[in-house]
Amino acid sequence: MKSDWKWDAFDPPERRVAEFLVQGKSNATICTEVFLSRARVQECIKRILIKTGADSTRGAIALLVEERETLSLLRVLQQATDGVVIIQDRLVKFANTALERIHGYEPNGMVGIPLVELMPPGSRNTTIKHYELRMRGEPAPTSYAIRILCKGGQEKDAMVASAGQISYCGRPAILGIVVERM
């Protein structure tokens, strides 16, 4: 599966140059540390701009800093005891270990799954309705009881709470918390 993370698109020299740019290092410093040629540094920065989709070095740095902060937050969310999910384009983009356990998936087994496949048919309309309302920035319930569908086909009762719309990889997404109800 193709990664959404800009850092993953860089080859090793680009990654080193990007690290130096994020740290605020000058082109002269980058020349001495990575390339001995100013032209090669400039060419590498051009490739970084293309791969990040930024129109300036400052814009690329801002995107990379935001991405790094997001990755740090995801590492924290991975440790949460409640299920945490990020949904973007109606697909699971992030699911922590607790959510994978609740749904019966192996680690990293939920990324890429359509949201509707995690709900039994009777819960799908409600879930999609709440997702669409949040994506449009309209009011939606902050928490609600729902049935979820596990990997093996069994259904469980759960509580879903949404933090609402967030930015994930530079685009709108929904952050949700799922707690299994016993």
Describe each model-derived feature in a short phrase.
Residues K2-W7, I50-L74:
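Basic, Lys/Arg-enriched C-terminal extension of HTH/homeodomain DNA-binding domains
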Residues E69-A95:
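Sensory modules in modular signal-transduction proteins
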Residues K93, T142, L149-K151, E155-D157:
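PAS-family sensory domains
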